[in-house]
Amino acid sequence: MKEILNALYHQKDLNDEEVKKLFTLIIHEKVSPVQLGTILCALKIKGESFKEISVAATTLLEHAPKPFDSGLDLIDNCGTGGDGLKTINVSTIAALIASSMGLSMAKHGSRSVSSHSGSADLLENLGVNIEMNPTQLENCFKQTHFGFLFAPLYHQSFKKSAPLRKELFTKTIFNCLGPLINPLRPKIQLLGVYDRSLCKTMALALKALGVKRAMVVNGGGTDEIVLHDITHACELKNSEILEYDLSAKDFDLPPYDLKELQIENAQESVQACLDILGNKGKDSHTMVVVANVASLLYLSHKAKDLKEGVSMTLEHLKTKAPYTHLQKIIRLSHA
């Protein structure tokens, strides 16, 4: 531990062996709160490298139980959170719609820290059992193409370190790790980050972890694809990383103001979700979700480009099938 701390004090990147040792100690609660706080802050000040992030994620995954083996290339759109803008839960609504269109969505998430409604909060408020056992989870996934993996059930180190991390009043490597440690190891990811500077780093980490296809995005300061501003993207395709910007025009959608996405409380998030799934949501809410679903369709090779993905999603919403699909997920999650 002394060597690890000294390396960080001198702002040196940790090697693979040091990262693996550090996170193994964290998992087994062999790091004191003072040491952990110091390490997290030192990593933050130095700037976490993609190698440090990917090796830490690999170590955490090695200690996480895998609930079942689907045999499919699963998809996740878990983001880092932490943008603090208190918008509707775009990624969770997008995952529900995408799964109703046949995409195999394995959604990894937890409760909110900086918003009114994290993925776990929204799903729980909708009536979904967020703590499904492996049998329930597999059954729900097989019948609906949707499974929610509540992060604290699989990663105790996250749960136990949460109070300390909250007291640091800053984002840490744990924010970056959340989207990378889905126990079902998805091969396709749409990953939103709270800071544009993380896009390339996280794309490299996904590549190192063996993800086949991904897009890491930051849109106007949010960890989503947005229509109110430019979305910066790093796309992992054929083992290469392509870096570019997206605007509403790339989706053939009109722009909307960020304020139209912001909500006052968790109940507003629930109502926005139900309205969108039932094809009666506000245009500003629906269209940003549609842009994110379109990106999932594109990454999954179900749409040739983003504009086709938008058309497919809008047509699907007209059927109101996503609303019926949610009711099935709720029922099966409790079965």
Swiss-Prot record:
Its EC number is 2.4.2.18. GO terms for molecular function: anthranilate phosphoribosyltransferase activity; magnesium ion binding. It comes from the Bacteria. The keyword Amino-acid biosynthesis applies. Pathway: Amino-acid biosynthesis; L-tryptophan biosynthesis; L-tryptophan from chorismate: step 2/5. Its cofactor is Mg(2+). HAMAP family: TrpD (MF_00211). Catalyzes the transfer of the phosphoribosyl group of 5-phosphorylribose-1-pyrophosphate (PRPP) to anthranilate to yield N-(5'-phosphoribosyl)-anthranilate (PRA). This is Anthranilate phosphoribosyltransferase. It comes from Helicobacter pylori (strain HPAG1).
